[in-house]
From Swiss-Prot:
The lineage of its organism: Eukaryota, Fungi, Dikarya, Ascomycota, Saccharomycotina. This is Large ribosomal subunit protein eL30. The keyword Ribonucleoprotein applies. One of its GO terms (cellular component) is cytosolic large ribosomal subunit. It comes from the Eukaryota. It comes from Candida glabrata (strain ATCC 2001 / BCRC 20586 / JCM 3761 / NBRC 0622 / NRRL Y-65 / CBS 138). Keywords: Ribonucleoprotein, Ribosomal protein. Gene3D superfamilies: 3.30.1330.30. One of its GO terms (molecular function) is structural constituent of ribosome. It holds the Pfam family Ribosomal_L7Ae.
């Protein structure tokens, strides 16, 4: 069974990570988790500035971490993780009960 990468299913998987897993929000904490090698997946919003995005990609490449480009902007990513503010980057440290790491491979 191939994973369906629709926006709705990704939002559901993100919600499950928020409930049962460990994650960090934001650029600085994501860079920190990438440098420490704790991050398993980073999710970048579509409207993240190019310089910031390239820096995240560089650190992800060094730590061999998967990168997923979220289709919506930072408003939608914030809503997907259940926050009432904008979120540019989400770093998944532990997926918990979610299969987001295998689905977004």
């Amino acid at each position: 069974m191939a994973p369906i990468k629709t926006q709705e299913s990704i939002n559901q998987k993100l919600a499950l990570v928020v409930k049962s897993g460990k994650f960090t929000l934001g650029y600085k904490s994501t860079i920190k988790s990438l440098r420490q090698g704790k991050s398993k997946l980073i999710i970048i919003a579509a409207n993240t500035p190019v310089l910031r995005k390239s820096e995240l990609e560089y650190y992800a490449m060094l730590s061999k971490t998967k990168v997923y480009y979220f289709q919506g902007g930072n408003n939608e990513l914030g809503t997907a993780v259940g926050k009432l503010f904008r979120v540019g980057v989400v770093s998944v440290l532990d997926a918990g009960d979610s299969d987001i790491l295998t689905a977004l491979a």
